[in-house]
Regions:
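Intrinsically disordered, low-complexity segments enriched in serine/threonine/proline/glycine
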Residues: 15-17, 21, 41
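Bacterial N-terminal signal peptides that target proteins for export
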Residues: 22-32
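Non-catalytic cap/lid and distal C-terminal segments of serine-dependent acyl enzymes
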Residues: 47-318
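Sec/Tat signal peptide C-region and signal peptidase I cleavage site
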Residues: 42-46
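Ala/Thr-enriched low-complexity intrinsically disordered regions
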Residues: 5-7, 19, 27
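Aromatic (phenylalanine/tyrosine) cluster motif
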Residues: 14-15, 33
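Bacterial N-terminal signal peptides
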Residues: 32-41
Length: 318
């Protein structure tokens, strides 16, 4: 690749003879620098992912699908693809990471909603990412959200969203992954335990295992027994935060209720069990100094590297 810098032109000529340059030489030098600027700009643009969005509808809910894809030509087998829940928040982080690291070559797909209203997004995600849940097992005491849309949401992603993405981008069907955080992490584990063949890699960040009386553990037990009978290569990254965020305004009773709801096995416990399975790669990382929210950009980066570069953060604690 051509590199036009002062060094390539010769330091002595660049600094020591500028005053005696002829008009022609000055013109040539200006052209060289102009070409160099164009080249640098072209390289930067080549590393900038192509970001787009389009809307879909399923089960009476409007969705916005956010996409970041490499600007370069796809390999013969197609690009890997990573589907991400909470797309409004996660896709911009993933797109930025792709722009900073050209090795992260994949199509990133964030499933989100066509609104910037945070309360509306919270309401919708509570429904899409959860099984039907009794009110007394929901940590919200007022304006209790509707739950139970998980199965329909998975079918929407697995059939409609995948089909649309594959019609727009060259995708490698053997390298598909799912990422989720919090309730999205719970959804990722649900997909793994109930629809394992839908993706080859999974990343669950601070998964809400405690949700609905820890019903996900029954799914896990069934998955483990079935997997032992028919093992196949599978990959999972689980990460967790180390700090609990403050919850001002809650009464002692509410805090006690919340603590009871969130007790029980953790993501680390699930990873410890799954890594014992044949052909199952399960990695884990705990961010001791990060909260549930502050870990997000860090865990997105870890997940992309785990899925695309086979870089495992296992046994690392921060």
């Amino acid at each position: 690749m051509l590199s036009l810098t002062p060094a390539s032109l010769g330091w002595r000529h660049f600094y020591g003879m500028g005053a005696r340059m002829s008009g022609m030489k000055k013109t040539i030098l200006k052209v060289c620098f102009m070409l160099g600027s164009i080249l640098v700009s072209a390289i930067a643009q080549a590393d900038t992912p192509q970001v787009s969005a389009f809307d879909m509808q399923a089960n009476g809910i409007d969705y916005r699908i956010f996409v970041a894809a490499p600007a370069k030509k796809a390999p013969a087998e197609g690009f890997p693809v990573i589907y991400m829940t909470d797309g409004n928040r996660m896709l911009p982080i993933a797109a930025k990471l792709m722009g900073e690291n050209p090795k992260l070559e994949a199509v990133f797909v964030g499933i989100g909603y066509p609104t910037d209203d945070k309360d509306e997004i919270v309401r919708l995600r509570y429904f899409d990412l959860t099984p039907p849940t009794p009110d007394d097992l929901i940590p919200v005491q007022t304006n209790i959200p509707k739950t139970g849309g998980r199965d329909a949401f998975f079918d929407f992603i697995n059939h409609q969203v995948k089909a649309e993405i594959e019609s727009r981008f060259p995708i490698d069907p053997t390298r598909q992954a799912l990422f989720g955080h919090s309730l999205g992490g719970l959804f990722t584990l649900y997909a793994l335990f109930n629809h394992a063949d839908s993706f080859q890699s999974y990343a669950a960040a601070d998964p809400s295992i405690w949700w609905n009386g820890r019903s996900i553990l029954a799914d896990k037990d069934r998955f483990v027994e079935a997997f032992k009978a028919n093992p196949k290569p599978m990959r999972l990254l689980v990460e967790s935060s180390g700090k609990r965020g403050e919850r001002p305004g809650r009464t002692k009773e509410e805090i006690k209720h919340l603590k009871k709801l969130r007790s029980g096995p953790s993501g680390a416990d699930i990873q410890t069990e799954l890594k014992q399975l044949p052909d199952f790669e399960a990695a884990y990382r705990r961010f001791d100094n990060e909260s549930h929210g502050s870990m997000i950009p860090l865990t997105v980066e870890d997940s992309l590297k785990f899925i695309l570069l086979n870089e495992s953060p296992s046994a690392q604690n921060n």
